[in-house]
């Protein structure tokens, strides 16, 4: 074991983050009643510049008046390269009550970006006497962001989650695609006349997972733009879950059930994990460090793998 300990991530479900524009308050009650673990009320890309101020008012009113149940309630502010973000933070922290759980910071390119928001939030919390600290989620959406992903992950104790914003990331990287997540038409190798598709987002997602797991942060898969393609959404979500991500964005209500389905361990997976733990307990009682389970070797590392699945299932059911 390394001298550097890997802290656990926040113990809360984050299977689905449902997004809705702050300029469409008619959607808020439906979002509050949804099955999403996290609701992201948006002030950024889905809101036109002339609508920013009203969207901010809409969100503050909704935070203070609607019943959000057990939802983890997050607001995506505008980017630090805009004239809107500071007013987003000030008004949210001064006017929205303690029901606000999280601020999502878009287009983060370095640790200083997180520090800037943290400093402002901390000052307002102290001035207003807020007793519940607001957490952060950041979105990696640029070449600079992925290049500095680990320093970003270590930037603030408020940081609880990190996502990849595929569209802006693709533009920053100069990628020849207009898709938002998913398989890209020309990203394949040709062998004996057959196309072998690959995943252009995999390397960036893997970097995010590694940085998040190192620093005790929840790694979350970003958007899948084609909300008419359920199987495409499931495929990308399964890949992300296998990679170590805990959930995925939903940009349409129909994607909520899909995300919850994929990121909830199946009964079969949980039963198998419990059987592996039981098999290893029996092996330990015999003085053995490994045993055979259904024809394959399991050992001490298998205990850790099985515990991941069991803990996730227990947290969701609770």
Curated annotation (Swiss-Prot):
Enzyme Commission number(s) of this protein: 4.1.3.24
Domain of life: Bacteria
Classification via InterPro entries: Aldolase/citrate-lyase_domain, Citrate_lyase_beta/mcl1/mcl2, Pyrv/PenolPyrv_kinase-like_dom, Pyrv_kinase-like_dom_sf
Positions annotated to bind Mg(2+): 141, 168
SUPFAM superfamilies: Phosphoenolpyruvate/pyruvate domain (SSF51621)
Alphabetic keyword roster: Lyase, Magnesium, Manganese, Metal-binding
A Pfam family per the record: HpcH_HpaI
UniProt xrefs under Gene3D superfamilies: Phosphoenolpyruvate-binding domains
Gene Ontology molecular functions: L-erythro-3-methylmalyl-CoA lyase activity; magnesium ion binding; malyl-CoA lyase activity; metal ion binding
Residue positions binding substrate: 19, 24, 30, 76, 167-168, 251-252
EC top class named in words: lyase
Gene Ontology biological-process annotations: oxaloacetate metabolic process
Cofactor(s) this protein requires: Mg(2+); Mn(2+)
Catalytic activity field: (S)-malyl-CoA = glyoxylate + acetyl-CoA; (2R,3S)-beta-methylmalyl-CoA = propanoyl-CoA + glyoxylate
Entry note: cofactor: Divalent cations such as magnesium or manganese.
Function: Involved in the ethylmalonyl-CoA pathway for acetate assimilation. Catalyzes the reversible condensation of glyoxylate and acetyl-CoA to L-malyl-CoA and the reversible condensation of glyoxylate and propionyl-CoA to yield beta-methylmalyl-CoA.
Homology family: Belongs to the HpcH/HpaI aldolase family.
Subunit comment: Homohexamer. Dimer of trimers.
Protein's name according to its UniProt entry: L-malyl-CoA/beta-methylmalyl-CoA lyase
């Amino acid at each position: 074991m390394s001298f550097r300990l890997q802290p656990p991530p926040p113990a809360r479900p984050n299977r689905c983050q449902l997004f809705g524009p702050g300029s469409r308050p008619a959607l808020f009650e439906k979002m509050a009643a949804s099955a999403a673990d996290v609701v992201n009320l948006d002030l950024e890309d889905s809101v036109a510049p002339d609508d920013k101020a009203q969207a901010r008012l809409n969100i503050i009113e909704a935070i203070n008046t609607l019943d959000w149940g057990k939802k983890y309630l997050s607001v995506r502010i505008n980017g630090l390269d805009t004239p809107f973000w500071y007013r987003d933070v000030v008004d949210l922290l001064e006017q929205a009550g303690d029901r606000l759980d999280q601020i999502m910071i878009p287009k983060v390119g370095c640790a200083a970006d997180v520090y800037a928001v943290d400093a402002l939030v901390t000052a307002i919390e102290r001035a207003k006497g807020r007793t519940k600290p607001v957490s952060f989620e950041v979105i990696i959406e640029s070449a600079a962001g992925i290049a500095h992903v680990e320093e970003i992950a270590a930037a603030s104790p408020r940081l609880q989650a990190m996502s990849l914003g595929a569209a802006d990331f693709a533009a920053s990287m100069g990628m020849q695609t207009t898709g938002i997540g998913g398989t890209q038409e020309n990203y394949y190798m040709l062998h004996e006349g057959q196309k072998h598709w690959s995943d252009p987002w995999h390397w960036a997602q893997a970097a995010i997972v590694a940085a998040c797991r190192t620093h005790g942060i929840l790694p979350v898969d970003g958007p899948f733009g084609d909300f008419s393609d359920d199987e495409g959404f499931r495929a990308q979500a399964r890949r992300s879950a296998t990679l170590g991500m805990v959930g995925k964005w939903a940009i349409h209500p129909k994607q909520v059930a899909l995300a919850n389905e994929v990121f909830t361990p199946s009964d079969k997976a949980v039963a198998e994990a419990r059987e592996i733990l039981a098999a290893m307990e029996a092996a330990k009682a015999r003085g053995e460090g490994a045993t055979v389970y259904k024809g394959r070797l399991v050992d001490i590392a298998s205990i850790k793998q099985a515990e991941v699945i069991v803990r996730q299932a227990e947290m969701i059911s609770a």
